[in-house]
Amino acid sequence: MTERQVQRVSQEDLGGWTYVAAVDDSEEEDRTLEAICPVDRVVLGGGFSITHDEARITQSLPLKDGSGWRVRAIGPDNAWRLRVNAICVDER
């Protein structure tokens, strides 16, 4: 059985905006991962990186409630990394 590891990589508060990221290093073929903004912040934009040539992004978009960024990817059944990041700003 494959263990899925998801973690927040970093969160830095820099002059009114925050960068957040999540990483999945599992061996799952079909993955959905979200980078979630801190409370009282909304997502301004987001993105991703993948580490395998055969992995494909099928979805990259903000969450409907504005609380983060979601990416869906499909890749091989061996280890590859999906990283999702988001830029969050003060909710005003």
Task: Give the positions of each predicted feature.
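Extracellular attachment/recognition segments
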Residues: M1-R92
